[in-house]
Amino acid sequence: MITEEVKSVLMNSMWDLATCANGEPNVVPVAFKDVSEDGKLLVGDVFLNVTLKNLNANGGRIAVSAYDAQTLTGYQVKGVAEYVTDGPVVAAFKAAVEKMFNGAAIAKGALIITPERVIVTTPGAQNGSEVK
């Protein structure tokens, strides 16, 4: 599902996380992100307060959008997020945030997103199709 092309776009682009609860959508850009070797999307929690509230209310449902601004190649990943507050993923994000913000911000945890569907958002004939 997370092909090499999808992973390349994810690794080289900013992500927007979309969640919804009680009919109120929310979207937030994230910079502290990664793709695990098993294809899960990892997001460091620095400013995800509304996102976390929505995930708690909606059973963890989330969508991630990323695209290459030069080529317009893009994907939307839909899946389920789990929130963790310790372990190697959280430790890595804590170190990265500490380094960037010199203590002015901290990573409180991480989202581990299990993809269920990957949808092409690139303009053209494949737009809207699902990556298998």
Model-predicted segments: where are they?
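Binding-site signature for planar aromatic cofactors or substrates
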Residues: 1-132
